């Protein structure tokens, strides 16, 4: 996952009231191997601060609290990536959309971002198909792997397009503008 998107996702998650790395793992599916280094980076950047607490099992655990700068970034940091180029990682795209929705982004902006990500995936899938068999011969390991990648990109593109359509349909008329 893109580091900046992971950082935004973690900040947004803490802005929703969660406090620990364990919460990130349990409720958001972020592994401790990803979240702990990200939390250290966020703490070094003064976006979160750690509060050691003794839990019910008398073990020390770290609760995290957003600083003013962290709260500001959590609520507005998604704008640049959303309006800029789509992150390549499918998980990053979904997490960025989650952050934007939490921050009450305009439906049109989120849907346009999803459409662009879907288009990029379709384009990648098309370019992945051109000439693959001529270069590698009959269907072998490389051709099978490439065919799988093309299928995955097509499925992701379809999902992102359907998600954009769903957002547009659910949004009240005033929020679409």
Q: Where does each model-flagged region fall?
A:
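Mid-protein regulatory/catalytic core that forms ligand/cofactor-binding pockets
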Residues: 107-177
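Generic structural signal for hydrophobic core residues of well-folded globular domains
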Residues: 14, 96-100, 163, 167
């Amino acid at each position: 996952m893109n580091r900046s998107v992971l950082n935004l996702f973690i900040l947004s998650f803490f802005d929703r009231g969660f406090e620990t790395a364990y919460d990130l793992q349990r409720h958001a599916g972020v592994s401790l191997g990803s979240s702990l280094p990200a939390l250290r980076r966020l703490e070094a950047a003064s976006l979160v601060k750690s509060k050691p607490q003794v839990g019910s099992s008398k073990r020390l655990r770290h609760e995290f609290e957003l600083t003013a700068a962290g709260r500001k970034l959590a609520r507005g940091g998604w704008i640049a990536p959303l309006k800029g180029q789509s992150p390549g990682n499918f998980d990053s795209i979904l997490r960025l959309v989650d952050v934007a929705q939490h921050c009450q982004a305009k439906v049109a902006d989120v849907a346009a971002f999803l459409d662009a990500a879907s288009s990029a995936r379709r384009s990648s899938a098309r370019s992945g198909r051109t000439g693959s068999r001529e270069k590698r011969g009959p269907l072998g390991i490389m051709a099978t792997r490439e065919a799988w990648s093309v299928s995955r990109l097509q499925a992701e593109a379809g999902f992102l397009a359907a998600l954009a359509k769903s957002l547009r349909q659910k949004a009240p008329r005033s929020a679409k503008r």
